[in-house]
Amino acid sequence: MERVTLRIPEQQIDEVEQMVERGKFPNRSEAIRSAVREMIDEHTDKTGAKSWAKV
């Protein structure tokens, strides 16, 4: 797995931390990976083509 560095507003990090504390995710990294997977799924049409990127 590749490491990616990004900047996220403090308020969003606080919200992610709250989800981790409530047990929805085991850690922040998994919460963010889940959000990325959800975004990819949301933007992939039924043929598998990504609507947001040229493939």
UniProtKB/Swiss-Prot annotation:
Query: What domain of life does the UniProt record list for this protein's source?
Result: Archaea
Query: Mind telling me which InterPro entries this protein's record contains?
Result: Arc_rbn_hlx_hlx (IPR013321), CopG (IPR002145), Ribbon_hlx_hlx (IPR010985)
Observed effect of gene inactivation: Deletion of the gene does not affect the growth rate but causes drastic increase in cell size together with morphology defects. Division is strongly impaired. However, a small subset of mutants are still able to divide. The deletion mutant is insensitive to the cell cycle inhibitor aphidicolin.
Q: Which CDD domains match?
A: RHH_NikR_HicB-like
Q: What induces or represses its expression, per the UniProt entry?
A: Part of the cdrS-ftsZ2 operon. Transcriptionally regulated by CdrL.
The record's subcellular location field reads: Cytoplasm
Please provide, in alphabetical order, the Gene Ontology terms of the cellular component aspect for this entry: cytoplasm
Q: What GO terms are given for molecular function?
A: DNA binding
Instruction: Share an example GO biological-process annotation for this protein.
Output: cell division
Q: Does the keyword S-adenosyl-L-methionine apply?
A: no
Q: Does the keyword Hydrolase apply?
A: no
Keywords associated with the record: Activator, Cell cycle, Cell division, Cytoplasm, DNA-binding, Transcription, Transcription regulation
Do you know which PANTHER family this protein is assigned to?
BLL4998 PROTEIN
Its family remark reads:
Belongs to the CdrS family.
Functional summary from the UniProt entry:
Transcriptional regulator which plays a central role in the regulation of cell division. Activates the expression of the gene encoding the cell division protein FtsZ2, and of other genes encoding proteins predicted to function in critical aspects of cell division. Required for normal cell division but not for cell elongation. May act during the transition from stasis to growth. The CdrSL-FtsZ2 transcriptional network might coordinate cell division timing with cell growth.
Instruction: Return the protein name.
Output: Transcriptional regulator CdrS
